[in-house]
Amino acid sequence: MANWRSLYPFASRFISIGGARMHYMDEAPVDASGATLLFVHGNPTWSFHWRRLIVALRSKYRCVAPDHLGCGLSDKPAHLLRLTDHIDNLSALIEHLDLRSITLVAQDWGGAIGLGAMLRLPERLSRMVLFNTGAFPPRYIPWRIRACRIPILGQLAVQGANLFSRAALRMTLARTSRLDPAVAAGYLAPYDSWANRRGVYGFVKDIPSGPRHPTWQTLAKIESGLPMLADRPSLLVWGLRDWCFLPDCLARFEEVWPQAEAHRLADAGHWVVEDAPDEVLPYIQRFLLTTDLTASRSARPVDTSSAAPGYNN
């Protein structure tokens, strides 16, 4: 496997949450009195996904990027972690580090996790940067995802053969058909065994198919809270050749945040940060320079916990 470590030049840090070690990076300039960028990844990625943005931005901004439990360099618990658990863990990290004036930067599942945490701690949030994500109950589940949820066969494919992570290396891109071997190795490195792929399969299982599912209820709570964040500056960058988070998802954010700055990249895919880095970085840099850190913090906290313990799916 190609050597990916030189692409990830960051010191590893850990916090203990419920007896498990959660990995994160915390890169900051000498004068770290300004904004904090909180990078929240999705599935099946990890903080490696943000490496180029952090290298480019850490000289001016504090950059914090955790790996969810079950992902990246964090511990891989044996039990299923639901969306509300990941929100709990991210909220604990935010409070442990006392992060304030946060600019949330999120993609895929990271949008629901990050916004779920920020709705619990709205006084800490200043701005939002979102890439191809959702924070509401899904109107559809793509067939590629449904196939991974077939009993027994889905788990064998995702957790056994690592097909979900391997397929992502190609199916999340549109401008190129193949990642550099070292980059591909970096994405796959933490997911090298059945046990280490529990979290990847757990995220697939936790996609809700109907209102009885506890994560559907969590997403509904997050969706109900999104209008409360409309006074925060927001940047939405979307790769339109994404078979998972379709343009409808972008439209749903624009509906609740009509002031949002939105960029549609017609020939970029789901991993828009990986597919179009030369466009994404300038959008972010300009947004950070031209928006206000002191946005209104009038929103009240929203309870984004699940109300359906014991659901077995």
What role is predicted for each listed range?
Residues 1-13, 20-24, 28-30, 36, ...:
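Flexible "cap/lid" subdomain of the alpha/beta-hydrolase fold that forms the substrate-access gate
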Residues 23, 41, 270:
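Histidine-centered active-site/metal-ligand motif
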Residues 27-73:
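Conserved HGGG/HGGXW glycine-rich cap/lid loop of the alpha/beta-hydrolase fold
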Residues 47, 112, 268-269:
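A short, glycine- and basic residue-enriched loop/turn
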Residues 58, 284, 303-306:
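N-terminal regions of proteins, emphasizing targeting and processing segments when present
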Residues 268-277, 281:
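Catalytic histidine-centered segment of alpha/beta-hydrolase-like enzymes
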Residues 291-306, 311-313:
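Alpha/beta-hydrolase-fold serine-hydrolase catalytic core, especially in secreted/extracellular enzymes
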